[in-house]
Design a protein with these regions (language model features):
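Outer-membrane beta-barrel biogenesis signature
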Residues: 21-68, 177-184, 435
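Residues that define the transmembrane beta-barrel architecture of outer-membrane proteins
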Residues: 81-87, 159-165, 183, 215-219, ...
Length: 452
């Protein structure tokens, strides 16, 4: 017979040394409840290390070797990579019977990204370098005066900070701990309060912009269902996130005129899994389990920070004469009212599909620790996707109202309020758009949780 103290010692040694894992507690298992010792609340700390990569391709209209009846041909351009370390302390406190409040503070310790030439592409063949969005010598935000060598063409500034504070409220209409004939069913809402410095890029002073927040407040509604059946514990989680409002310093501003989809896209997610117990000692409150889970997350069309956002901002700086991505702030006035491209762009719908394997342990009635490996893939999608504008109804027709045009046509007229000032035709029109392909991600980390 192995003593409970030895079990605890070995589990702690295994899990605390597994720094290359991503630990997230089963989202449906614990229900904080006001005034009840042992379940009054929980404090947890989650550490994550995330790696992301993608192939960047570019549409090239006019390719003489392409089929004129086929979609615009795409050419390999760049290879994107990014890593991020995140530490998230979280506090759940019971405020009433099976009702609790939550506060979480994600802290990005460091985030770094870079772009290299794709395999088989040299500096003379890269569409991005050919069009002058980056210089032939590349751009190093950490050392702007030194040319980049090899296949490296862009290195961003290391970023860090607090992107948001999450406030939540949850309620469990059913709790298996109280009635073992029923599952545990939870409902909740989380408010994401955007704080901290907004993520911007300044080619003149790159070290002055190290923020990580998008500056957009969001709301997430979620529900989970969990049922422990002997040594098995299946669960499911559904969630929906919608942007609410942007801070005045955020890049997500409505320029008016014919602009559409100026906020980040909504997100719908489904996560499901099963926890399998190898040890489940109800007397000593020790357990050891492995969990298998999967998820599907739908990202709907909207503006966002793509893999190329810093390059777009670099090439759209209105302070640099002749920059190719400078925007026109007022399309109704003659000439160009130069406005810097913010870097964010309209991004096509895409799916994120992932799966994870976790090792979880309970050490006595209060302590939970876990380690998880999470792998995900993102479907190919367009990352420069802004419409040229909107065709307004003809004035005087039924339902036209005051926001109308005098011409009776079905086109977006240049030089009118139909034009979208946020669109950069050089990257947003069909035949010039950027695509993000072969997206892969890996998240590794550990979690510790204490109940009180």
């Amino acid at each position: 017979m192995i003593s409970s103290s030895l079990v605890r010692t070995r589990l702690a040694a295994i899990l605390l040394t597994a720094v290359a894992t991503n630990a997230r507690a089963n989202p449906a298992a614990i229900v904080p409840s006001g005034g009840e010792a042992g379940t009054a609340g929980a404090f947890s700390v989650d550490y994550e290390y995330e790696l992301d990569s993608a192939r960047i391709t570019r549409e090239r209209a006019g390719d003489p070797t392409a089929d004129p009846l086929a979609p615009p041909p795409k050419h390999d351009d760049l290879q994107f990579s990014q890593f991020r370390h995140t530490l998230t302390p979280r506090l759940d406190v019971g405020v009433y019977h099976d009702t609790w409040a939550t506060i979480a503070l994600p802290i990005i310790i460091t985030q770094a990204r870079e772009l290299r030439l794709a395999s088989g592409v040299d500096r003379n063949a890269s569409p991005t370098l050919q069009d002058g969005y980056l210089p032939q010598t590349g751009y190093d935000a950490q050392d702007p005066t030194t040319p980049l060598s090899g296949d490296l063409v862009f290195r961003g500034q290391d970023r860090k900070g607090i992107p948001e504070i999450r406030f939540g409220l949850g309620f469990a209409p059913m709790n298996q701990r109280r009635d073992d004939t029923k599952p545990t069913w939870k409902l909740g809402a989380d408010f994401h309060l955007a704080v901290g410095r907004v993520m911007r890029f300044d080619r003149m002073a790159p070290d002055a912009e190290t923020g990580v927040s998008d500056g957009v407040h969001k709301l997430t509604l979620w529900t989970t269902m969990d049922r422990k059946l002997g040594f098995y514990e299946p669960w499911i989680k559904l969630a929906w996130t919608v942007p609410l409002a942007a801070r005045s310093t955020s890049l997500f501003q409505d320029p008016g005129f014919g602009a559409t989809n100026v906020m980040p896209g909504q997100i719908a997610a489904a996560q499901f899994g099963v926890e399998l117990y190898a040890v489940d000692d109800k007397v000593e409150h020790n357990s050891l389990s492995i969990e298998l889970s999967g998820r599907v997350k739908a990202h709907f069309e909207g503006r966002g920070y793509s893999e190329m956002w810093e390059v777009f901002a670099y090439a759209g700086d209105a302070r640099v004469a002749g920059n190719p991505l400078v925007l026109d702030a007022d399309p109704t006035n003659a000439g160009i009212q130069a406005q810097s491209h913010p870097g964010i762009s309209n991004i096509e719908n895409y799916l994120e599909v992932g799966g994870s394997v976790a090792i979880r342990a309970q050490l006595g009635p209060r302590v939970h620790i876990a380690a998880t490996v999470d792998v995900f893939k993102i479907t190919d999608h367009v990352i420069s996707f802004a419409d040229s504008g909107i065709d307004l109804p003809t004035c005087g027709t039924a339902g036209a109202g005051t926001n109308c045009e005098t011409d009776a046509n079905d086109v977006v007229n240049p030089g009118t309020k139909e034009i979208n000032p946020a669109a950069a035709p050089a990257i947003d029109r069909v035949g010039a758009r950027y695509h993000s392909e072969q997206n892969l991600g890996l998240v590794l980390g550990v979690t510790g949780q204490v109940l009180f």
